[in-house]
């Protein structure tokens, strides 16, 4: 995943 730093 690209935008998965820990949010949602």
Swiss-Prot record:
GO terms for cellular component: extracellular region. Keywords: Ion channel impairing toxin, Secreted, Toxin, Voltage-gated sodium channel impairing toxin. It is found in: Secreted. One of its GO terms (molecular function) is toxin activity. Expressed by the venom gland. Its main location: secreted. It comes from the Eukaryota. The keyword Secreted applies. Negative results: has no effect on voltage-gated potassium channels. Has no effect on voltage-gated sodium channels Nav1.2/SCN2A, Nav1.3/SCN3A, Nav1.4/SCN4A and a sodium channel from B.germanica. Belongs to the non-disulfide-bridged peptide (NDBP) superfamily. Short antimicrobial peptide (group 4) family. This is Venom peptide 7.1. It comes from Tityus serrulatus (Brazilian scorpion).
């Amino acid at each position: 995943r690209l935008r998965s730093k820990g949010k949602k």
